[in-house]
Amino acid sequence: MTKPLRIGIVAGELSGDTLGEGFIKSIKAQYPDAEFVGIGGPKMIAQGCDSLFDMEELAVMGLVEVLGRLPRLLKVKAELVRYFTQNPPDVFIGIDAPDFNLRLEKTLKDNGIKTVHYVSPSVWAWRPKRIFKIDAATDLVLAFLPFEKAFYDKYNVACEFIGHTLADAIPMETDKIAARDLLGLEQEREWLAVLPGSRGGEVALIAKPFIETCQRIHKQHPNMGFVVAAVNEKRREQFETIWKATAPELDFVIIQDTARNVMTAADAVLLASGTVALECMLVKRPMVVGYQVNKLTGWIAQKLSITEFVSLPNVLAGKELVQEFIQEECHPDFLYPAMEKVLNNDNRELIEKFTEMHQWIRKDADKQAANAVLRLINKETAE
């Protein structure tokens, strides 16, 4: 009797738990007896993953927080190394969380276990020399975007472009009317979605210039509605405080819902850079991108950066499709004219380009990831 397929897997945050869930489902569709063990969140556990530690153990952000938790993180890593070397899986998958997973993958690879890193770190954008560490730690990288694979190919590092899970999740055509109904927004108004970031540090720097931009837009478009996506109660309160101090006369509808629903309900979007810009492209809404970090972080990022663009739609297109304003340029003097241009344009060509790019990265990423891993360990795949 053949032994069931055994896969080691570690996800470090909620987004990784979602990727892990889809990956496990796709493997089990082909190998129903497959076993999964490592660290997962509630979604992975519901699919049958045996989680040896709570995923929260790995969910630390920022240098100070990481330093405070370092002894515990090192202990978890040592325990996982001991477990997997004593009970070797057919393959180990590290999902995102590169600071933790790449170190774990390197040790496991050195012990003869095949390793895969799922979600490429942004080596194509900054600190490109990390690619040598990735090569030493992995047998294969699974990349969401085609330019990531092109970067790995340049260095002869094994990588497969699997498409993006967001491109699979978001329909080719989104329903603005249904989104407005869902969020309770007036159908007959024009709406601008405002997304000033999901982290406290982002909102602290980006909300004010975004609100001041809305002030200027309101003068030209007095009937325009402004709808803000807040990821949680803390960000809602933070935005409200900045709004009341900056432009109390303006009306904002603040919604604690997914950014995707808020963008779908809007006619145009003013957003902080990040995955949300890709999501905005996929819901086919014209956008202007603004981003700001503290001056020291910005200076360091500028020195280490190797890309011309910050927002994913532009990086993906290899040219400026959407205007982006970074650091000092994240100011109403720049944001307002760009936003006016978007609001006074039919944006048809841009939406056509967004649709073309959506099709390009829509490949059933869960299935592609599963098949790439199965090929690595010489298992049959359902193409």
From Swiss-Prot:
GO (cellular component) term, any one: membrane
InterPro entries (UniProt xref): Glyco_trans_19 (IPR003835)
Top-level taxon in the UniProt lineage: Bacteria
EC number: 2.4.1.182
SUPFAM superfamilies for this protein: UDP-Glycosyltransferase/glycogen phosphorylase (SSF53756)
Pathway: Bacterial outer membrane biogenesis; LPS lipid A biosynthesis
Keyword set, alphabetical order: Glycosyltransferase, Lipid A biosynthesis, Lipid biosynthesis, Lipid metabolism, Transferase
The keyword rRNA-binding appears for this protein: no
Keyword DNA repair applies: no
Catalytic reaction list: a lipid X + a UDP-2-N,3-O-bis[(3R)-3-hydroxyacyl]-alpha-D-glucosamine = a lipid A disaccharide + UDP + H(+)
EC class (word): transferase
Listed Pfam families: LpxB
UniProt record, GO biological process: lipid A biosynthetic process
GO molecular function annotations of the record: lipid-A-disaccharide synthase activity; phospholipid binding
PANTHER family to which the protein is assigned, alphabetical: LIPID-A-DISACCHARIDE SYNTHASE, LIPID-A-DISACCHARIDE SYNTHASE, MITOCHONDRIAL-RELATED
HAMAP family xrefs: LpxB
Assigned protein family: Belongs to the LpxB family.
Protein's job: Condensation of UDP-2,3-diacylglucosamine and 2,3-diacylglucosamine-1-phosphate to form lipid A disaccharide, a precursor of lipid A, a phosphorylated glycolipid that anchors the lipopolysaccharide to the outer membrane of the cell.
Name of the featured protein: Lipid-A-disaccharide synthase
Organism: Aliivibrio fischeri (strain ATCC 700601 / ES114) (Vibrio fischeri)
